[in-house]
UniProtKB/Swiss-Prot annotation:
Protein name, entry field: Uracil nucleotide/cysteinyl leukotriene receptor
GO biological process terms, semicolon-separated: G protein-coupled receptor signaling pathway; negative regulation of inflammatory response to antigenic stimulus; oligodendrocyte differentiation
GO cellular component: plasma membrane
Membrane topology of this protein: Multi-pass membrane protein
Bridged cysteine pairs (disulfide): C132-C209
Key word Transmembrane present: yes
Function (record text): Dual specificity receptor for uracil nucleotides and cysteinyl leukotrienes (CysLTs). Signals through G(i) and inhibition of adenylyl cyclase. May mediate brain damage by nucleotides and CysLTs following ischemia.
Stored Pfam families: 7tm_1
Organism encoding this protein: Homo sapiens
Lineage top rank: taxon: Eukaryota
Residues the record marks as carrying a glycan: N42, N204, N282
Amino acid sequence: MSKRSWWAGSRKPPREMLKLSGSDSSQSMNGLEVAPPGLITNFSLATAEQCGQETPLENMLFASFYLLDFILALVGNTLALWLFIRDHKSGTPANVFLMHLAVADLSCVLVLPTRLVYHFSGNHWPFGEIACRLTGFLFYLNMYASIYFLTCISADRFLAIVHPVKSLKLRRPLYAHLACAFLWVVVAVAMAPLLVSPQTVQTNHTVVCLQLYREKASHHALVSLAVAFTFPFITTVTCYLLIIRSLRQGLRVEKRLKTKAVRMIAIVLAIFLVCFVPYHVNRSVYVLHYRSHGASCATQRILALANRITSCLTSLNGALDPIMYFFVAEKFRHALCNLLCGKRLKGPPPSFEGKTNESSLSAKSEL
């Protein structure tokens, strides 16, 4: 049987039903305990073994990537969260969204060491069934929570710049906290099936941790892609296009603030394009492929490798978000430089959000 990668990107056809847990399994075949035959797809174990193996070089590269990602993301998001909490008195919507974004990143960063061990061990999962489920749950929780928090930041910027006066009552810290709480609940409930479905299989002395959607090869998977990614992505792009159009139409905003607005747009969209778009495009192709069947071994190998690479890019989000904080949140940048350099930067007192008024169009906010 293939020792294929466990994380969400390197999924096989719906074989998450396969499970080896001692006496819990109902059958045994060639040393592999499996679930009842009705739960297994027509993709044979032999085909998976031939087409989906990872090489030692791939394991080393993936492990090295996750090690670097873990260090950068842990340091960056821990520092960011500390600064945001310390500055909680600012009470701005953007501060609230950024703080929750840092929490989402940390929820995934803390389980990255399990991936390191998995790859350094040659695709062997030594942590057990529960840890396997929890790792996949936190992976998806971080990814989709991050996507929606970035969308909230985009919508908040749109209201602050394009409708500064009309949005005063709507853009309140309390509403931002409620929106974040709602998103946490929705994403956690959506990912909850990963906590209750079997996720490990064993062949000989090697345990593989699989993280799959049960509906991976069904219409439900495509609906999930549309709701969980396409909608927030289109919303984010639309908000920023409207912001750019308003700035180009001559709104009374200082040149410096216009530059900051454009910079934030570029960084957020870059995070989407680098971290999330490749993964979801590849996953769409993967879902459609396993609905059609009949692909060659070479095609299956390419799809599996693409899944692993795009999953790495998704995890990179945790390391890129602190860079976004540094370039788009002036107060974060000043606080970080003061902390690291031991001296204050020159310039006006920084703030995540200034006062909103009709002449400035609230452009002095979190940009």
